[in-house]
Amino acid sequence: MSKRHRLDLGEDYPSGKKRAGTDGKDRERDRDREDRSKDRDRERDRGDREREREKEKEKELRASTNAMLISAGLPPLKASHSAHSTHSAHSTHSTHSAHSTHTGHTGHTSLPQCINPFTNLPHTPRYYDILKKRLQLPVWEYKDRFTDILVRHQSFVLVGETGSGKTTQIPQWCVEYMRSLPGPKRGVACTQPRRVAAMSVAQRVADEMDVMLGQEVGYSIRFEDCSSAKTILKYMTDGMLLREAMNDPLLERYGVIILDEAHERTLATDILMGVLKEVVRQRSDLKVIVMSATLDAGKFQIYFDNCPLLTIPGRTHPVEIFYTPEPERDYLEAAIRTVIQIHMCEEEEGDLLLFLTGQEEIDEACKRIKREVDDLGPEVGDIKIIPLYSTLPPQQQQRIFEPPPPKKQNGAIGRKVVVSTNIAETSLTIDGVVFVIDPGFAKQKVYNPRIRVESLLVTAISKASAQQRAGRAGRTRPGKCFRLYTEKAYKTEMQDNTYPEILRSNLGSVVLQLKKLGIDDLVHFDFMDPPAPETLMRALELLNYLAALNDDGDLTELGSMMAEFPLDPQLAKMVIASCDYNCSNEVLSITAMLSVPQCFVRPTEAKKAADEAKMRFAHIDGDHLTLLNVYHAFKQNHESVQWCYDNFINYRSLMSADNVRQQLSRIMDRFNLPRRSTDFTSRDYYINIRKALVTGYFMQVAHLERTGHYLTVKDNQVVQLHPSTVLDHKPEWVLYNEFVLTTKNYIRTCTDIKPEWLVKIAPQYYDMSNFPQCEAKRQLDRIIAKLQSKEYSQY
């Protein structure tokens, strides 16, 4: 053996030759050798024991993971192969990775990973962490029963209490079912009544499926589509699915459609149920699942031809309910007081959930709670206050899942306080909530067809809503619900269930969509709760005056185009008609501004400064043109956040408006509607915009009476200009965007108009033969007479 290739046998290897005179040394060396050998044996034994323990650990971990995977309906992991295994060459093509990888810095062996069927990559460790939590949801016990019903029935009703996991898990099981079928793979749609729920649930499910949001899992809400050609599971608002049905009446893209939160009975959900009931008859391969959080599901079963019912209980704990002895005069004040008291006095850990009615109220409450807790000094526990309402951007909505602040050294408890609209009633589940404060109010749409007024009013909630709110406190452990109303009010004054939205809404948009879907016989359309005939008649009348329907009630070319815009019919008409007045660019901007939340910020501590800032944008002719000024200034200042802050403008609203404007522009381009502007230096620049406003809102006009108040034209309702208007004078004729019912009747977002435009632009509506007697009629009669004479022909 050459020196270079000789094995290094070590100095312990006995040599064949014995050196003379070294007996004593040899004995000593032998003893050393023995000691070292024993040490090595001990080391080897310890190493063997360590390896055995590692193997045992790995075996246990694999066994528990396999049990978890098998219960989830996934294949178990295989044992890892050695590098020389005959299978290793094919490991990349197998459904499991064949090698266990060694992490050098710890020496631990990680488990072989399952391949994600959607990405063809190994699942991330986070996937398994989330999977463990998923498998603890009550809904998992019912997976086999669910799959069995899904296979055997075309439609069925599923009742699952909030927190059972139905919204996140059922759609994923439907994806599994669709992937198991032969032929082209259709998608799964899951509708939500609220934008916030559609966005946050889609994000959660994308995490659970270990995919990127917007790829295999996406969402679609008005003015925002986060999906792609790869999307197989789409969460969307019910209105968006209805819009998809207009261009795809049989909804061929989907194999399963889930109507979630159906108990909320929104306008779009009710219409969708009627549409899907018909689609199911024409498509035997379509599955429809109606999901509800309340137990009054019998009505849904009967509606869908006595289909089966699957009930999944939630995991709820007892909730202690407290009422106020006397009615509260100011529920907002009482709510803030209750939050502070619970935070200071309750010795149990646990987060708070406060229900309020809208964004302004929520922002105000958040500010005041923070201020009051800060004033209490450092001895009190830290508090994290999180608002929740539909117009919050997705990343801020995700804050509700953050942990509460830690305990202080003095033992003071840190708490999370979520201040939410009724979206937290059933749509979203927030773990960790132990205390619920329920003032007993929510904003509801109310419609009076006689005077054609639809308003959002703060009204008392139903008993069903109150029960849902209380249930939020018992999700993780026994909780407490503080109702800021009396027990007598709960028992005697509250309705059992919330009135379906279809019975209290203006149906203009709905009728236009149904006509676009080819449903002409509205009287015999299968509504779950048919609306009042008068409400339907008012909707048909509105669409006829807007020229969306002809006198026979058929959809016109204009009406068909209007239906493609995700806007109220009046706004859609105004956008299309603005092309004829050379101001479609400006009307697009105004429409976008009207489609987003209020852009003017008016903080309690800086009302005067905010009002002064607003007046810098004010246009003499009114609020619509003021909104246009704000949008133009925002763009000229390069969409600056600081500029918005300095001018008391809501940056988020302006960015949303910009997004809405781009989407509406794309729809205009699709129909070859020209986007143009009148020369800014022309005296007609603002006149043309105001005329375009009249094309959509000629039915929403008020006339100033000699007594100093306004009367709405035709309906003769006494109204006043809303205090927020920039009009510093009282024009004789005003067009208004909305009628606000509060302590007084207000008209909001108003513009000064000329009566001549009314009779020229909407002669059918301003036909004097069926006009009620009033000062406005006498004025219009005179104008019509003048217009008919040649002297006024320039109009």
UniProtKB/Swiss-Prot annotation:
Catalytic class of the enzyme: hydrolase
SMART domains: DEXDc, HA2, HELICc
Residues covered by the Helicase ATP-binding domain: 147-313
Composition bias, Basic and acidic residues: 20-62
Domain Helicase C-terminal, chain residue ranges per copy: 338-518
Modified residues (N6-acetyllysine): K488
Gene Ontology terms for molecular function: ATP binding; ATP hydrolysis activity; double-stranded RNA binding; RNA helicase activity
Keywords annotated in UniProt: Acetylation, ATP-binding, Helicase, Hydrolase, Immunity, Innate immunity, Isopeptide bond, mRNA processing, mRNA splicing, Nucleotide-binding, Nucleus, Phosphoprotein, RNA-binding, Ubl conjugation
One GO CC annotation: nuclear speck
Region ranges (Disordered): 1-111
EC number: 3.6.4.13
Catalytic activity: ATP + H2O = ADP + phosphate + H(+)
UniProt short sequence motif DEAH box, positions renumbered to this chain: 260-263
Subunit and partners: Component of the U11/U12 snRNPs that are part of the U12-type spliceosome. Identified in the Intron Large spliceosome complex (IL, also named intron lariat spliceosome), a post-mRNA release spliceosomal complex containing the excised intron, U2, U5 and U6 snRNPs, and splicing factors; the association may be transient. The IL complex exists in two distinct conformations, one with the DHX15 (ILS2) and one without (ILS1). Interacts with TFIP11 (via G-patch domain); indicative for a recruitment to the IL complex. Interacts with SSB/La.
Family, per entry: Belongs to the DEAD box helicase family. DEAH subfamily. DDX15/PRP43 sub-subfamily.
Protein name in UniProt: ATP-dependent RNA helicase DHX15
